Amino acid sequence: MGNWITSTFLRFDLFQRHQPNRFLEYTRVQHSNQSPAYSVRTAAEIVAHQRMKPNHSNDSDTDFSSDDEGCPKMTPHEEQQMFEREQHIAFSGRCHIGDPESCTQLRNEINSRCGPRPSTSNNMEFILNRDLQKRGTSISNPRTVARVLNSHLPNQKRRVDRVATKSFCTQYIQNGTKIVVASQDEKIRFYQRNPDKSKYRSKYMKSDELRVDQCGWSILDTAISLNGDLIAYGTWKDAVFVGKLDFTERQNITWFPIDLNGEPGRDHCAVFCVKFSDSSEQIVCGTSQYSIHVFDVEQRRRIRTIVNAHEDDVNSVCFADLGSNLIYSAGDDGLVKVWDKRAWSDGDVEPVGVFAGHRDGVTHVDSRQDERYLLSNSKDQTIKVWDLRKFSNMSGVEATRACVQSQHWDYRWQPAPPGLCQPVAGDTSVMTLRGHSVLHTLVRANFSPESTGRRYIYTGCARGEVVVYDIMSGTVSRRLKGHTAVVRECDWHPTENEIVSSAWDGVTTVWTWDERQEGVIAPYDHPNISQFGDEDSCDELFQPVKKQCRRQRKTMSSRGHPCSSSSISQN
């Protein structure tokens, strides 16, 4: 068996050059007293390593030279410059403009709604921000509000809660007065903001806790109706569960399952995403059976099913416009599709358009609510912005399909392979943003709210960060570090410069702006930038200085206490 293993797998031309000795070691031990199981394990490891290795078709079959041979020599100073340059690119993000005309129109529209981002050193902007932060005080000009908020992006964190389980979903509800968080322990928790007159008015305290009726592995998505009286969730069950929110009787909530297939009790299907329409009369969801379902909430029944809407799991759906006539969907086939409900009455359930350009599955899709632009977040580690007027042609769709089918890695436990940044032929996206990590779970990205002029795109990250991209510059405006595990979802407050995030470390965090942090927090081109978002920046952790009587101060001074004035003068 050892000879068969050797002849089948041990082709040294397939190994990476920088690790030849690792596999040559096997030739030294293959004739020793090793068990067949050891041989099989070694061969399997070689095959797995080959799958993750990029193809070097032009390499010589007998070239075992070091990678350093043939490379230009660099001085230590040049190496340091290269490291700093690559570090700057990694932190500031990368942007590729695919459609200059649409990108210019988008940026002009943003500039007309909020203007250029002012400097935080402007005293007038600080005064406006102070007035804006006062409860009961409002600035009537939306453009001024957007300028103020955009000049004071969140930069410090405040922990809301920590649970001993993974948190999957989080969002603001009831105009930002409450936060809802869904976790793997089959619970949905609500956090209420303290009253405006409270000393800690920016703090959120847990007010309610609901246990779901049925759950498979975890709650995968939650949705709250616009008026806040209905809640829906999806999990590994063949149903969407809907309940009426009544916080006065929160322990007696009744969940009504709406079956997907008319066969209750089956649980091999997953509902990855759930969304209410603006009128709260309908719910749309995407499933692991490649299908999209639309439900009537009042009648609690399924009114439309699009079978094989995608060629793989439907990871995300959303209503595109205020009338809830258009639906965006995204799946593991790497495509984003647009559906028009108005055409369904004629029996036409085909998409009205398709966007192609990703090299791997799409994890989330979001509408800019302007009936023109949308975004998609993908396992190819990019966010793409699309123009609704410019769909992809069939050649672009086929190119995307070929790229997705050529992927042989699993984002749930493997690192992203090289080559994902190469553009796809027929990509019609407006711009492509890169600078965050999409691993382990369906990480979500969204446009910032209307109060910011929808200038930013923010997303969770597998590195435990909240990454905020500026559409105007195409770079990272904020990289909020504070979690120790993947951030699956985050949400921007509808009217204030505040972001909430929940992660697999069980921590729910609210990010706000603090003027004291601007001394150490700056854009990534600042020469003194190091790290920010640390919890030490929060004044809630500062220890208060206790008052001491005069006799105690004299005693400490005579004993040479390290905090006494005499001790300080001696040092």
Swiss-Prot record:
Q: Where is this region: Disordered?
A: 51-75
Q: In what ranges is there compositional bias, type Acidic residues?
A: 60-69
Family matches, as InterPro entries: DCAF, DCAF11/LEC14B, WD40/YVTN_repeat-like_dom_sf, WD40_repeat_dom_sf, WD40_rpt
**Among the entry's GO cellular component annotations, what is one?**
mitochondrial outer membrane
The family database entries (SMART domains) matched by this protein are listed as: WD40
Gene3D superfamilies per the record?
Answer: YVTN repeat-like/Quinoprotein amine dehydrogenase (2.130.10.10)
NAD as a keyword of this entry, yes or no, is no
Q: Does the keyword Repeat apply?
A: yes
**What's one GO MF term for it?**
RNA polymerase II-specific DNA-binding transcription factor binding
Q: Which regions does the record annotate with the repeat WD? A: 162-201, 266-305, 309-349, 357-396, 435-479, 482-521
Q: Which UniProt keywords apply?
A: Repeat, WD repeat
Annotated GO biological processes are: cellular detoxification; determination of adult lifespan; negative regulation of cellular response to manganese ion; negative regulation of transcription by RNA polymerase II; positive regulation of multicellular organism growth; proteasome-mediated ubiquitin-dependent protein catabolic process; regulation of cellular response to stress
Q: What disulfide bonds does the UniProt entry report for this chain? A: none
What is the documented disruption phenotype for this protein? Increased lifespan. RNAi-mediated knockdown significantly prevents Mn(2+)-induced dopaminergic CEP neuron degeneration. RNAi-mediated knockdown increases tatn-1 expression and enzymatic activity.
Role of this protein = Involved in regulation of lifespan. Required for dopaminergic CEP neuron degeneration in response to Mn(2+). Inhibits the skn-1-mediated up-regulation of tatn-1.
Q: Which family does it belong to?
A: Belongs to the WD repeat LEC14B family.
Can you name this protein? DDB1- and CUL4-associated factor 11 homolog
What's the gene?
wdr-23
